[in-house]
Amino acid sequence: MDGDDLIASVYRKIEREKALITAASNMRQSTDNPLVQQRVDANIRDGRKNIAYLEEKMRELQLRQMKQEGASPTDKRLPPNPDGSAPVPPPKDYAPGYSGHEREYGDASGAYPHGGAGTMPSGAPFADPRPFAPVPKARPNYTKLDLIKYDTPYLGPKIQLMLSQLEFKLSVEKQYKAGIEKMVRLYQDEGDRKSRQDAEGRRIESNQKIQLLKQALKRYEDLHVDIESAEAPDDESLSTPNLRKPLTGLLTLRIHAVEDVDHAASSRFSRGPETFVVVKVEDAIKARTKATRTDKWQDEPFNIEIDKANEIELTVYDKSGDRPTPIGMLWVRISDIAEEMRRKKIESEFNASGWVSADKMEHGAAHGRQDAGGAPGSSNRPPSGGHSGGPGQGYAGGAPGGASAGPVLIDSWFALEPVGRIHLTLSFAKQLKDRRPFDIGLNRQGAVRQKKEEVHEKQGHKFVTQQFYNIMRCALCGDFLKYAAGMQCADCKYTCHRKCYPKVVTKCISKANYETDPDEEKINHRIPHRFEGFSNISANWCCHCGYLLPFGRKSAKRCTECGLTCHAQCTHLVPDFCGMSMEAANQILETLIRAKNHNKSASVSSGLSGRTLRPGGPPQAPQDNVALAYPQKPVEGAYGAPQRQPSAEAISAATNTYIPPQSPTAAQRQHIPPRTSSSQSPAAAAAAAAAAATGLRTPQQASDPNRPVQPPPSSHAHYDPAAYASYQQAIPPQAMQKMGAPYGMPQQQQQQAVAPMQQQVAVKEEIPPQQPKVRIGLDHFNFLAVLGKGNFGKVMLAETKSTKKLYAIKVLKKEFIIENDEVESTKSEKRVFLIANKERHPFLLNLHACFQTETRVYFVMEYISGGDLMLHIQRGQFGLKRAQFYAAEVLLALKYFHENGVIYRDLKLDNILLTLDGHIKIADYGLCKENMWYGSTTSTFCGTPEFMAPEILLDKKYGRAVDWWAFGVLIYQMLLQQSPFRGEDEDEIYDAILADEPLYPIHMPRDSVSILQKLLTREPELRLGSGPTDAQEVMSHAFFRNINWDDIYHKRVPPPFLPTISSPTDTSNFDQEFTSVTPVLTPVQSVLSQAMQEEFRGFSYTADFA
């Protein structure tokens, strides 16, 4: 529909509403019945509200049409480059901050130019290059509960929500009615008269509910305006996985009155109908009000115990005859009640505090200046009357805190469907196992990581059990998974019932080439779908991954032939079965496989029964994969829309067309290159590392005059993480030229690097390697204290028996590592340590050695005795200069990680240690992810709740930008001594991250607000630091205008604070909960098999500088 037709359509809707208002006004004048007048007044009110909404849409359409017809070139979005191409990402080894090759830290061009007084930094050398850079749009400040309230001003979002909800409710009610009709026929056949009458009554009620739902759906469809906007993102709020978990607790509900409902018709001489309300929780009746003829209830409180439920349903009935008639319905999600109460609690705390959101500060509220000469902390002292330095104090203006004045209740009129409203008072008390105090203090939190589920392999799919907290649709049979567990492929996200996954015989496209599959795996029905974009305004599900499609045009595709719908990113995963349902396709394939097996001998049949007949590479981890470029080939793996089922003759004909080919043997088809572990050739790996150390130095490393002098190489081979990774994955030299060598390295130089490795390996085969100087083991150390504990194990302070040097040793149980499938994660942590060791980065914790015993593995790390920043911020508030100093050093550490393809993913105060000379060291590399360059993505759900970026919570692919979000939370905590997103449990924190806007003291310096606003941008592509220049964007911000980066890197800036200890073994800067524990290794009873011990071969390591 073009612009003129759309405007004409909206105009007709407006005229229709005006005609309805005129007719309602005439009716009101012609009657004296107060009930009729009340109903007519409600219709007029709703009509005027609808006209205001439609007129607003009309203005939007007219304005957009004027821009399209008369827009100048400058009005349009400009591409990043003049030729329209995307900006070129920097090479992986591009490090302008450290080398004299491009720009020094102290170079004037690398620092922020003085004079930019606005919120947006002017002239930053690494800012967004576009003249009209995208700016995050203001987020509407409403909740899902606001949308179902009667007087909600957000009519547009409400229409979208109700279109989806009503269509789903209608489809469920139709299924329910079909089931009841079968019961009626069954009871009729059995002659059970009483049961038949009961079922017949339920069938009548279901029919009445269907009519109500159709009436409500039509009302919203008449109001909906389909405005196609390329700029508007799709609304994915209804299809958010892993977010809305079923809740347990106590629901307090009070029903006061109903108004403006269409009462059931009654005879002329009878009294009015009796009205009552039934409350259901997950289809089970939990409460019922008394019957009334006044539409009011005086004392109807209900306390309802909720046990892992998602939704409550309120249905208003009129009883004027033998059977009650439903006249109005309302559905309320329990999680929406809990979210509304959380927001009300926060609002009550902040109302009198003087803290505001960033957008309000930009309208003249914030004029604070970040004065370099000001006293540290001059603008962020705690409010008067508070004790300075306490863990709960904040910025000037009065920090929010303390308990609210009374219990938080939700009292409002809610809209009934299709007409009317109901007055409710609601509250919900969640039952929590580990309730956090709802205050502003900072406390330690452990990181969470997605558990690796048991993998069920079927036809190349790696199915894992997944608990879904929203309505899903099975890709095989097409039925719903309602808040239930299902099976989902970890690679292609194919989703189905638990009972359906054994029936899946179509292949996983992420692991195969359809064209090379054996003929017996295919059927002759290969008709591709014709997918085209469409505006999704109702409840449609993806036929592959099963999620509800988002509202809008960007992500929704529909087949113009068979009506199948899916996500745009799932279209290449849908098989070419247009016109055939997935159940029929799988039935045909099963028949073909049975015929093939019948024609083969018993021995061959038994040999192939459990195999996936496809060549494939080494198995990949089901989680946390770098984004895969799926081959653009059709795949069997999605359900078809309900279509005609092929007849038995058609299935027989398809079976008969199959001719068993003279295929090669199973062993040839199943040939997989053997996987070589890193431990099979330790001498080769060490030799390769030695060659790499001498031959793979980048020009920046060779030409940097400011680099600290490195110690001369030792006689034994130097360990290089790139070579370690290359040999562990057994990459051949041809592939290593593409993957192992640094990005942007000339091909000739890469070949020269490979050749010495091969020569060195040959030499090592002939000449026995020299004995290492010292083989470090457990008997070299005395354990003195426990420094920390976690689900990983312990970190203990130890001293060497010979030199009395102190080290921090991280101890992990092998049994725990194997049970939790963390072997590869442990090896990855070691590789990240080697990356930090490579340049002895000043702000990263270094590794001195690794060793192992029969039951444990040990990381021997440098000991940092100053404690972590969490301890110090709890002892006293950081001033502005101190927070800026720590933030600058953390930024350089993240910059180094990102330049080496590592994202950190667990940035928090607990993981930042303070040395005795006042500088920081980032520790704990357990959640780091390697091979994450610009544009690379992964999807593992992990991190510390308060620091997790929105894209992680939304189960989306994410990249390096998650570190910059966490960096923003870190700066906020250091400046304001509280978290920007908080709640009583993890779910509330996640809700806050996705919905709340961070609040700031009214006099907070503008540059501080600006950097937090840009780092805490929910759209990752718009976040500061998300571009190809990465950390340089953040370094160029006005918040760091007075920072000389070269001086920071070389520790020439005097630190603002120096921790103190009474002796080298003083552990007073660590939590007494841990240091009071006796430092002993608890006995391990289990014995690991030889195969389990093999998993840790090659783990031992000693650094050159140790």
UniProtKB/Swiss-Prot annotation:
Keyword Repeat: yes
Modification Phosphoserine, positions: S1100
Active site: D906 (proton acceptor)
SMART domains found in the cross-reference section: C1, C2, Hr1, S_TK_X, S_TKc
Residue stretches of biased makeup (Basic and acidic residues): 361-370
Annotated Pfam families: C1_1, HR1, Pkinase, Pkinase_C
Name of the protein: Protein kinase C
Organism of provenance: Aspergillus fumigatus (strain ATCC MYA-4609 / CBS 101355 / FGSC A1100 / Af293) (Neosartorya fumigata)
Gene that produces this protein: pkcA
